């Protein structure tokens, strides 16, 4: 049987379900595939096939996450659903599945619960830009309790707005009833997907952003100069472009005099491609792995930031003991690792394996950093945690 080719005829969006345990995230994921399969836009995935999730690895951390794909008339979606709370935390922090938006599932009978709040905060810290709310289990609410649902909606809107998510649409429904095929509730799933289509914009393609390439290696070609190689993270680079070399030392400027891929010369290199760039006036000792080459003034190097981090448990190959303020592990960004000194937030004595916490980090060398960027924390050659930069300080 031949493999189907991926048809790139609709914009592609990555989304995920988030929310408190047992509020119906996986049931909703199954209900979406059921509702859309009726229109030939998805293959129906039942609850057990989603719940029986494969493991994936991101930055050395094992995450249980299930990926389902489906389409609406306008778009193609990849949807991630995780079974355990810790898996959500790890998935969001490591960016194993980068989300362009999320569906927050809240049970109408419970309202916002601790993990609801934690997932909203995490979504904000790791840069999930948009949220659509599905108020689930509405079939369990009696007529006389109907106004309680209005209160739950108000509380949710306030909670979301507090974290910077203003005006999120809230769709009421029942994932279980929709999964069972109840027509009026299936309609609510269609309404939800319409809200997702309308309220989660198609992200800017990486190719339209300012050029950036982390340097992986440096070569000297006699008579031609210095070549740096790496995978272009975003944007486009052309022969003749002015570029900056940022990180580890003072920022320098240069001009790209050649772009090569697989030993062939190209007029330009684009996001996702592995290329070699020939740089004018730069010696082999002026550049090193871990610096980045970028469009001038698009990125700066920094030494201090706040990060939302998840620290691995012992069973996940992490530390066996807690750490305290003053801890000095390696922080791994793109192609470089730099020692950093950790400061814990006020009122936090120590961080235990398995915790997720916001820390303040002072790096011993400057690195090209941006908010929303992912990093790994390593000690003695093994990953002990992962994080996302939530704020740059200096």
UniProtKB/Swiss-Prot annotation:
Region (G4): 136-139
Catalyzed reactions: GTP + H2O = GDP + phosphate + H(+)
Record region (G3): 81-84
InterPro entries: EF-Tu_GTP-bd, EF-Tu_GTPase, EFTu-like_2, EFTU_2, G_TR_CS, P-loop_NTPase, Small_GTP-bd, T_Tr_GTP-bd_dom
Keyword Metal-binding: yes
Residue segments, region G2: 60-64
Domain tr-type G positions: 10-204
Domain of life: Bacteria
Region of interest (G5), ranges: 174-176
Localization per Swiss-Prot or TrEMBL: Cytoplasm
Ranges in coiled-coil conformation: none
HAMAP family linked to this entry: EF_Tu_B
Family: Belongs to the TRAFAC class translation factor GTPase superfamily. Classic translation factor GTPase family. EF-Tu/EF-1A subfamily.
Function: GTP hydrolase that promotes the GTP-dependent binding of aminoacyl-tRNA to the A-site of ribosomes during protein biosynthesis.
Quaternary context: Monomer.
The protein's name in its UniProt record: Elongation factor Tu
Taxonomic lineage: Bacteria, Pseudomonadati, Chlamydiota, Chlamydiia, Chlamydiales
């Amino acid at each position: 049987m031949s493999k189907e080719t991926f048809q790139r005829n609709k914009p592609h969006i990555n989304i995920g379900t988030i929310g408190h345990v047992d509020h119906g995230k996986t049931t909703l994921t199954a209900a979406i595939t059921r509702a859309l399969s009726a229109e030939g836009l998805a293959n129906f995935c039942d609850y057990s096939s989603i719940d029986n999730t494969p493991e994936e690895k991101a930055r050395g951390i094992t995450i249980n996450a299930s990926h389902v794909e489906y389409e609406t008339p306008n778009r193609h979606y990849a949807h991630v659903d995780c079974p355990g709370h810790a898996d959500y935390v790890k998935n969001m922090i490591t960016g194993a599945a980068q989300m362009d938006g999320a569906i927050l599932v809240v049970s109408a009978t419970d309202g916002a619960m601790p993990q609801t709040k934690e997932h909203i905060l995490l979504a904000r810290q790791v840069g999930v830009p948009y949220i659509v709310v599905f108020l689930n289990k509405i079939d369990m609410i009696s007529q006389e309790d109907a106004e309680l649902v209005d209160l739950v909606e108000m509380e949710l809107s306030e909670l979301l707005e507090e974290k910077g998510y203003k005006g999120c649409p809230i769709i009421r429904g029942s994932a279980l009833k929709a999964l069972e095929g109840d027509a009026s509730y299936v309609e609510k799933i269609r309404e939800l997907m319409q809200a997702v289509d309308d309220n989660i914009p198609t992200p800017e393609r990486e190719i339209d952003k300012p050029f950036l390439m982390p340097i992986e290696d440096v070569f000297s070609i006699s008579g031609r100069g210095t070549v740096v190689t790496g995978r272009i993270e975003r944007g486009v680079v052309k022969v003749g472009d002015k570029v900056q070399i940022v990180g580890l030392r003072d920022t320098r400027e240069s001009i790209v005099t050649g772009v090569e891929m697989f030993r062939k010369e190209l007029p330009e290199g684009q996001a996702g491609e592995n290329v070699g760039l020939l740089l004018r006036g730069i010696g082999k000792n002026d550049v090193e792995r871990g610096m980045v080459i970028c469009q001038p003034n698009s990125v700066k190097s920094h030494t201090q930031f706040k990060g939302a981090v998840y620290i691995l448990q012992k069973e996940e190959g992490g530390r066996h003991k807690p750490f305290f303020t003053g801890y000095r592990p390696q922080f791994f960004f793109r192609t470089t690792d730099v020692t950093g000194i950790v400061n814990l937030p006020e009122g936090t004595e120590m961080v235990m394996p398995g915790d997720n916490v916001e820390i303040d980090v002072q790096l011993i060398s400057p690195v090209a950093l941006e908010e929303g960027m992912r990093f790994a924390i390593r000690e003695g050659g093994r990953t002990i945690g992962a994080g996302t930069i939530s704020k740059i300080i200096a």
